[in-house]
Regions:
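Long, contiguous all-alpha helical interaction modules
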Residues: 1-125, 129-131, 280-458
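Domain-exit/linker segments immediately C-terminal to small folded modules
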Residues: 174-336
Length: 458
């Protein structure tokens, strides 16, 4: 059994990006161990593959996965790269350091991404050297903590914006001085071209969307965080599927731009939708190994300011929450497949009311309904009955009005993928020729059934 050890950058987003990509690339792995190099205080991933050259295999798998994101990156309106031609921007990293041309203001990012992957393909040996235990060096120079991943290129501004000034232990990294007081300085992280290309391509692949709030640009990035546990091959496959579902939910729902406008609403909608898709398997996998409950799905949002980025509000969903939603759904009377179907209806109800609260002429009404939909979902998830009953009463009262119900059902049905429309049409409407109309009626029926069921349970 061959093993490889990958050293992770001590930057939250960069570390999560690497964990996400390594887990997704673990198709040949027997085990992944997420731990800490206690000598240097750096997070590491130990990869166990029953073949020679495990790191080569893992990196080729990773490159193949990144290739699959070409169309997604090309569709992104913008990405979190500072391309101004000025000192300190990301421009010099790519055009001078890697020789990869950044796109113009009106050009898409697909061509840049393709060129970046081409560079990465030709420099996989650099990546191996830069992320291996032997290739990472650290020390203190002129009061600055320096961490070198095989080269001298800066990382993207977004990644290093989470660097820090600190007196003392450098945020958990050990001061290499053996005597005297701790150094006062900055943490400076450098890498070779291969590592920079890998981190950049992975960041673009995991960028779910971009938009703006007022005049401020906002970027949404989804990642997975795993700390201090061992993951086996089939568990890695399960985690990859869970993350794929999470990422697709964020990307699909971000057309309504809820990730930054209503973080709580998006979190609840994502929790219930993920459960509807993977809840049955999550119960089995996590029930067998409770340690997996700690694994987190993270949505992070960032905005640029000058030559750096700052982290905005985001959210986290643990796999424990996903698995535990089964008992919560059973507590309000849903069993079998109904648990998963109803969870998806709740997710769409949250998103559709939030969307209408932004665009409908009766914004006040839909803001109240959105608040009640969130409270209902929260109460079910946490099994707190009182807010559940209050929210249910108000939702039931307003949705007796046919125009309100149909408006919500219209927006909710738009969230259903075209390829899955037939499976969402209820038996009562299977015979209708207009499939979208049949879907609309089915969605209205599902919403009413949900509320009637909960009223009876209450």
């Amino acid at each position: 059994m061959a093993e490889a050890r990958i050293v992770l950058p001590p930057l939250k987003l960069a570390s999560e990006i690497m964990k996400t990509m390594v887990t997704a690339s673990c198709v040949n792995c027997e085990k992944l161990r997420f731990g800490l190099d206690t000598t240097r205080g750096l997070e590491v991933i130990e990869v166990e593959i029953p073949q020679r050259n495990p790191l080569d295999i893992l990196l080729h798998n990773m490159l193949n996965i990144l290739e699959g994101y070409r169309e997604h990156v090309d569709r992104l309106g913008d990405v979190p790269i500072l391309r101004q031609r000025m000192t300190g921007s990301d421009y010099d990293i790519f055009e001078e350091g890697l020789g990869v041309k950044l796109p113009g203001r009106r050009e898409k990012w697909g061509g840049f991404y393709t060129s970046l992957l081409g560079y990465l393909r030709e420099h996989l040996d650099e990546v191996k050297a830069g992320i291996s235990t032997d290739g990472v060096t650290l020390g203190v120079e002129k009061g600055n903590f320096k961490l070198i991943f095989g080269g001298d290129l800066r990382l993207l501004r977004l990644l290093v914006s989470e660097g820090f000034y600190e007196l003392g232990k450098f945020g958990g990294l050990k001061d290499v001085k053996s005597t005297g007081r701790p150094s006062l300085g900055i943490v400076e992280i450098r890498a070779n071209g291969g590592v920079v290309a890998l981190l950049t391509a992975s960041l673009l692949a995991l960028t779910a969307g971009s938009g703006s709030i007022g005049e401020t640009d906002v970027y949404v990035i989804s990642t997975m965080d795993i700390v201090g546990i061992e993951v086996r091959r089939l568990e890695a496959k399960f985690l990859t599927d869970v993350f794929r579902q999470f990422n697709s939910i964020i990307r699909d729902k971000s057309q309504y731009w809820m990730p930054v406008e209503d973080v709580d609403g998006m979190r609840l909608a994502a929790l219930f939708e993920i459960y509807s898709r993977v809840g049955e398997e999550a119960e089995k996998v996590i029930g067998g190994r409770r340690v997996l409950e700690s694994i987190r799905l993270n949505l992070s949002t960032f905005s640029p300011t000058g030559l750096r980025f700052y982290r905005r509000e985001g959210f986290t969903i643990s796999l424990g929450e996903v698995a535990n939603l089964s008992s919560a759904m059973e507590a309000v009377g849903f069993t079998g497949w109904d648990k998963y179907k109803v969870a998806s209806t709740i997710a769409r109800l949250i998103i559709s009311t939030l969307y209408l609260s932004k665009i409908a002429s009766e914004q006040g009404l839909y803001k109240r309904l959105a608040s009640d939909a969130k409270m209902l979902a929260y109460s079910i998830a946490t099994e707190e009955r009182r807010p559940y009953l209050d929210a249910l009463y108000r939702l039931s009262r307003y949705l007796r009005e046919e125009d309100v119900l149909w408006r919500i059902a219209q927006e909710s049905s738009e969230l259903i993928d075209e390829e899955h429309v037939e499976s969402y049409i209820e038996d009562d409407y299977k015979g209708e020729k207009d499939r979208r109309k049949a879907l609309l009626k089915s969605e209205a029926q599902r919403i009413l059934r949900l509320l009637y069921h909960l009223v009876k349970q209450g």
